Amino acid sequence: MLKYRPFEMHCHTRHSDGTFLVPQLIESVAAYGYAGLALTDHNAVTGLLEVTEELQRKNNCLVLPGIEWTTFYGHLLVIGCDRFVDWRFVTPDTIDEALQEIRAAGGIAGVAHPCEVGSPLMCGCNW
């Protein structure tokens, strides 16, 4: 029988535009009863360097490696890749190839803000 384990799949730390330090975020997510989180800072994976097995074990909180690709064409959550997949030059014409590369790296991807219609700062999803 499958067991439901709630996860926070889209969160940021001070490594991009969040307010929490990595340990604070993990502690907060665990305090709310989540089993884990995907650390998805904007165009940064440096926060993952602060995630330790001890921190996860102490809080009973699994941390999935992720990143939020933040481009002029939209924001894409990329979770679970075993290597870096370059987002810097992805365009609507090359998104299919980028998605194939994410999959080849063992990752999954999803639109970060599917209902955002766009603004000068948040371009929505124009993939």
Regions found by a protein language model. Name each.
Residues 1-108, 112, 119-127:
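A metal-dependent hydrolase metal-coordination microenvironment
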